[in-house]
Amino acid sequence: DIYVYCAEIPTAETRENLLEKYCSIAEFGNHYWESEDNTVMNNGVPVDIIYREVDRFGRYIDTVIKGGKAFNGYTTAFWHNIKNSKVLFDKTGTFTKFRDMAQIDFPENLRSAIIKNNRNLLNGKLPSYDRQIKKAQERGDIVSVNHRITAFLESYFDVIFALNRQTHPG
């Protein structure tokens, strides 16, 4: 994967005009998860190019890393991505500044929030995943069982990484 952090995401048409000569197969402007171009380069190497607005990560740092906001799984995945990015080009230094801000120890308030939020989702509460899985199983809804097990694992791994003060690799 190649992540392109920019002030404004270029249009799919602009990206296609720039990249098409380097690709044997390409889909420009996919938005299944993020704004991305999915390609196979002329040398046969598959490359996914994901475009992100850099200001979004300033808000993420403020909300999650500094503010201690937990999500239902994958809480620190963007932090992990920022922290471990290899900067190839940064004309303004904006992304490098965010990456440098991400080089901190795991904040205790975030660790506690992740554990509390996701632990409550695992079991012991009325809407906990264990109860959702059991209800889906009782009604014979195997698709829902699978869906809730996946959500359970997302929260479970969020807790494991937080307990160990490690960012989630996504």
Feature locations, PLM:
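Short, charged amphipathic alpha-helical segments flanked by flexible coils
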Residues: R165-G170
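Extended, well-ordered alpha-helical segments in internal regulatory regions
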Residues: S155-N164
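Solenoid-repeat scaffolds in large eukaryotic assemblies
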Residues: S144-V145
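Catalytic metal-binding acidic patch
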Residues: D1-K21, N38-Y51
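Conserved NTP/Mg2+-binding pocket subregion across the NTase superfamily
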Residues: A26-Q137
